[in-house]
């Protein structure tokens, strides 16, 4: 039986902590044997958040650090259960601080439901989330009772399903390159193999089915653009296919033509029955789903907060339906639509609501509160049905505690905890009076920050340090103050003296949250304050091992519309990026698409190159390997302009970004393009290594310090500095690079040296240092699966204070924006509550002295002492 949840109405003004135990991740132990060859060790060290590793790492770390079997954690279960149960409350609060109280009856489903279709008197729901090596789930729901009558297990699902004229249901098999035919008894009657990753599909007659391939592979195994194929369901053969561009997502068959949303190219492509392309229609950013009303199509543009209304008779856009009235460029994240009774219903994942529009005027009539991250809306009979991808219990108490289960995909991993839901409410309740009340409720659930309050602190320099995957309890549970649980601490004071000292000397932030569950979402939030609906889905697919690639922060279809560096450039605020690959790829593509056009040859070569890189994994050393020898030669736009005259360097840059010499040729002939690339290069430190566990964070510190001291001598320290310090990620229990404690101690020591160096520099008097993790996926925590360690230091930061105010990564972005004068990036950080509670108007200029590290490897200790002597 499903769990039926009836959340209480919002209790206004409450800021609460809903207890959740993120425990020790059960799963298969992936300790690499000592006699494995070095290639396996290096592969694991190079691969950033390998899907099959992440759930294992905490179990490995627990057994290695505690020196006892994983089952030893059982002694802590009783206390954890009591805390979790005692903290249950009716109101649900997201990591962002937004509050949930969805309308209607709530039915709990599987993980990340993204698609639903009425079929044979039931609602068939595709749960497309994190299911490790177990199959994903198709739930057969009786909407009136909310009962899940049957569950089908299909290994891989893309969020697309459609009923054919013959009465059967077709389901897209995603990364398994299959299509499934389900009969009216809800059994899989047949499966078909196709030649690419199956995406959107639509039957066109009793025999033929149009299927999109999200992407394909070439003979070298590289990912290439997608296709539109016609599948003969009687023979199982593909009759014909045609190129459909980068990441075609959904297909509709209207008036004898196929309409395909091309998510990666921001357009709708039109094909005739023979798959000859007969037109294209520009859309907004990241078009995904569509809904139809006769000859009109509504195309949902997820990243530009609008629906493109298409007149299929004329083949032209007939207007736009806008979903954002909040004064921010994007962020409501529309995900689906339905047309019924003179209205258009649109799910807004960024507002946790369904927007209701008058179909004729295209004006918004109001908002209906939904659960967390609504992804699908339907009107079926008398009911409005809404899928909520992340459910209605975002901060889930886990009363079973950290079970030492050996099952794959156990109940304690952060993505496993996310269970979706179905909201069911009478469509008649969506009246003018009901909408007015519901709209107020949705808006009342937002954080309450008023931007006019502002800051009046003389902070001119912000140093923004991002680390990897640690929860609060895992590091600071033994702090002795704040809300910590020392029984869950793996890297306590004996390993992380700097982090403990920072929490004690400045502020203890024990109520600070990551906005994404995993690193691909976390880095999107730390760099852009946003993660697109496609990224949310693809991230879950990658971490469950279904998608074997790493396009994140690289391939344009999975990047954000705007990043920190875009806002900084617009505000003419100087900045410097250390190690964050997202900058290298996203900024380069923006320049190419703005200067030459997204359909230009160079922009398309960039797309192909990043698709090729993504088929391997995220290679953090690709840029460093060719560029580090040029360190110091591109630190200003003028210097970088001269460097672009160096044929060898420009050839390396061209190969890095487009895979051949075509960019080098364009840079020589196009003065404006060369000028913009010179500015782009001058913002990135060539000799600061990105992801690579074989490279010490102490060496990253050394590269940063040399850069910083040169800037300080010249009086040219950038106002915003982004540093990625990744080695607290660890390599699990594989100790041939370092032990887990040594990795974390190395990271801790490097952080201490960074803070100390800034505090003894001329810019300390007007600086703020903010430190946070990208996510908490790899650590236990008794409060919440997304609670992370975070630190603040600077003359205007309070000393010796415990700050219990609720903050998140968006709070840090908003704080930096207010202090430095750059605009909010989107709705998320525009509504975020800044870090008001950390500040003191009276400066304390006392420098910070980092404590001596205690758990370094011999090599790191020697390097640390060398760096100390060199200061």
Short names for language-model regions:
Residues 2, 111-117, 430, 510, ...:
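Short amphipathic alpha-helical segments with coiled-coil-like heptad repeat character
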Residues 34-455:
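Predominantly soluble domains enriched in secretory-pathway, periplasmic, or organellar proteins
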Residues 418, 432-871:
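N-terminal pro-sequences and low-complexity stem/linker regions of secreted or lumenal proteins
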Residues 28-32:
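Sec/Tat signal peptide C-region and signal peptidase I cleavage site
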Residues 1-11:
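N-terminal secretory signal peptides that target proteins for export/translocation
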Residues 13, 33-35, 604-605:
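A cross-taxon signal for low-complexity, glycine/charged-rich
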Residues 14-25:
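Bacterial N-terminal signal peptides
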